[in-house]
């Protein structure tokens, strides 16, 4: 049986699990801070990702280090001054009292869907 192309297109739109690429936006893109400061970094997803979000810390010349997964679960060995919150589209990484060893680049990553 032949299915008209228009109908096939509509059916594809309704396929469960069919998703567009998810765009992640972090803010601020850069900032200055001093030891002892409370630092907050936000991450926004272009569509809902439930709690499928991880935060990483990367220092120059080193591989990224996982800090937080499932939006708020601290990876073993990560100091408790790091915390994560949020669900859906809006997420936050907070460092409650910045230490000298925390000066680094921080990234969020969604793992709700893959390209």
UniProtKB/Swiss-Prot annotation:
State if Membrane is listed as a keyword.
yes
Q: List GO terms (cellular component aspect).
A: extracellular region; immunoglobulin complex; plasma membrane
Q: Where is this region: Complementarity-determining-2?
A: 70-76
In residue numbers, the region (Framework-3) covers 77-108
User: Where does the Ig-like domain lie?
Assistant: 21-115
Source organism superkingdom? Eukaryota
Q: List the disulfide bonds.
A: 43-108
Q: Where in the cell is it found?
A: Secreted; Cell membrane
Q: Spell out the residue ranges making up region: Framework-1.
A: 21-43
**What keywords is this UniProt entry annotated with?**
Adaptive immunity, Cell membrane, Disulfide bond, Immunity, Immunoglobulin, Immunoglobulin domain, Membrane, Secreted, Signal
SMART domains from the UniProt entry: IGv
Pfam families membership: V-set
Gene Ontology BP annotations: adaptive immune response; immune response
- Signal peptide range equals 1-20
UniProt region (Complementarity-determining-1), positions on chain: 44-54
Segments carrying the region annotation (Complementarity-determining-3) are 109-115
Listed InterPro entries: Ig-like_dom, Ig-like_dom_sf, Ig-like_fold, Ig_V-set, IgV_Light_Chain
Q: Annotated region Framework-2: where?
A: 55-69
User: Which PANTHER family did the record assign?
Assistant: IMMUNOGLOBULIN LIGHT CHAIN (PTHR23267)
Q: How would you summarize the oligomeric state and partners of this protein?
A: Immunoglobulins are composed of two identical heavy chains and two identical light chains; disulfide-linked.
Q: What does this protein do?
A: V region of the variable domain of immunoglobulin light chains that participates in the antigen recognition. Immunoglobulins, also known as antibodies, are membrane-bound or secreted glycoproteins produced by B lymphocytes. In the recognition phase of humoral immunity, the membrane-bound immunoglobulins serve as receptors which, upon binding of a specific antigen, trigger the clonal expansion and differentiation of B lymphocytes into immunoglobulins-secreting plasma cells.
Q: What is this protein called?
A: Immunoglobulin kappa variable 1-8
Q: Specify the species.
A: Homo sapiens (Human)
Tell me the gene name. IGKV1-8
């Amino acid at each position: 049986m032949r299915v008209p192309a228009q109908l096939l297109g509509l059916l594809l739109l309704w396929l469960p699990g069919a998703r567009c690429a998810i765009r992640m936006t972090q803010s601020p893109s850069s900032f200055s801070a001093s030891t002892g400061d409370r630092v907050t970094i936000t991450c926004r997803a272009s569509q809902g990702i439930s709690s499928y979000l991880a935060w990483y810390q990367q220092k120059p010349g080193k591989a990224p280090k996982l800090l937080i997964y499932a939006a708020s679960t601290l990876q073993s060995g990560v100091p408790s001054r790091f915390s994560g919150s949020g669900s859906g589209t809006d997420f936050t990484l907070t460092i409650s009292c910045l230490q000298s060893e925390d000066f680094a680049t921080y990234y969020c990553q969604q793992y709700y869907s893959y390209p």
